[in-house]
Amino acid sequence: MRKKVIAGNWKMNKVLSEAGEFMNSVVPKAPKGNDVEAIVCAPFPFLSKLVEQAKGSEVKVAAQNMHFEDSGAFTGEVSPVMLKDLGVTHVVLGHSERRELFAETNELVNKKTKAAFAHDLTPIVCVGETLDQREANETMNIVGEQVKQAVAGLTNEQVAETIIAYEPVWAIGTGKTATSEQANEVCTEIRKVVAEVTSADVAEKVIIQYGGSVKPANVDELLAQSDIDGALVGGASLDPESFLQLVEAGTK
C-alpha cells in the first residue's frame, strides 16, 4: 500500500512573515502517522526558517528547484549541498514552468535528479503535456519520454524512491482540471513506463502525484483513483486551512 503524498508548491508567493504564519497554523494540526506525508515546497529564502518550524513534526520542507552541481561559478543558483545542509528533504524538479519559462530540458532534469539522489534528497519530478500535445493525441508519448529520460541512469532503488508528479500543463492555474479518469489514465501509463525501464515491483513502489488545479472540492475523487498517490498543489496550498484539508484527504 503506497502512502499518499500531498505537496504544496507555493511558487513565487508569500514573504517570510507569511510563511512563518502558515507553518504556525499547519504544523500543530498536520496528521500524524504513516498514511500521508505533507510537504511544503517554498521559495529559497524561507527554507531555513520553515525547516526550523517543522522540527519535531511530520511536515517536510522542499525546495522548488536546484542546480545539479555541488558548487562553483553559477551566479544566482542553489546547490543540492546547500539544500541538504539546511535540512530540506525534497526538491521539485522539471516543473512545467521551469521547462517553459527557463528552457529546462529532459536532459537537465535528469542531471538534477541524479544530483538529488547523490545528496539524499527526494526528487519530485514533474511531467506533463501541453494542450496542443493532448489534442494531437501525443500525451502518452510525451509524458512517457519525460519519465524515461528523468530516471535514466538511476538504480532501481532510486527510481522506486522518486516521486513523479503528473501535471498536464493545460490544467495548471487555469481552473481546468483533468477528470479523475483522464488523470488516472496517464498515471497508469507512467507506472507502466517505469515498469518497462525497471521492473513491475519497482513501478508498484513509485509514488505518482497529480497536479493541476487540485483543491479540497476535487481532491477526494482524484485520490480515490488506483494510480494516483497524492497531489502537487499550487494555489490551494497557499492557505493553511485549505492545505490541511488536502492533507487530511490523504488519510481517508
Swiss-Prot record:
Question: Recorded E.C. number(s)?
Answer: 5.3.1.1
The listed locations are:
Cytoplasm
Keyword Disulfide bond carried by entry: no
- CDD domains given for it? TIM (cd00311)
Q: In which pathway does it act?
A: Carbohydrate biosynthesis; gluconeogenesis; Carbohydrate degradation; glycolysis; D-glyceraldehyde 3-phosphate from glycerone phosphate: step 1/1
| Keywords from the named record | Cytoplasm, Gluconeogenesis, Glycolysis, Isomerase, Phosphoprotein
Q: Which reaction does it catalyse?
A: D-glyceraldehyde 3-phosphate = dihydroxyacetone phosphate
Q: Which GO terms describe its biological process?
A: gluconeogenesis; glyceraldehyde-3-phosphate biosynthetic process; glycerol catabolic process; glycolytic process
Q: Where does substrate bind?
A: N9, W10, K11, G173, S213, G234, G235
SUPFAM superfamilies recorded: Triosephosphate isomerase (TIM) (SSF51351)
**Which InterPro entries does this chain map to?**
Aldolase_TIM (IPR013785), TIM_sf (IPR035990), TrioseP_Isoase_bac/euk (IPR022896), Triosephosphate_isomerase (IPR000652), Triosephosphate_isomerase_AS (IPR020861)
Q: What is its main location?
A: cytoplasm
Please give the NCBIfam families that the UniProt record associates with this protein: tim
The role this protein plays is:
Involved in the gluconeogenesis. Catalyzes stereospecifically the conversion of dihydroxyacetone phosphate (DHAP) to D-glyceraldehyde-3-phosphate (G3P).
What quaternary arrangement does the UniProt entry report? Homodimer.
Protein name, UniProt field = Triosephosphate isomerase
Gene assigned in the entry: tpiA
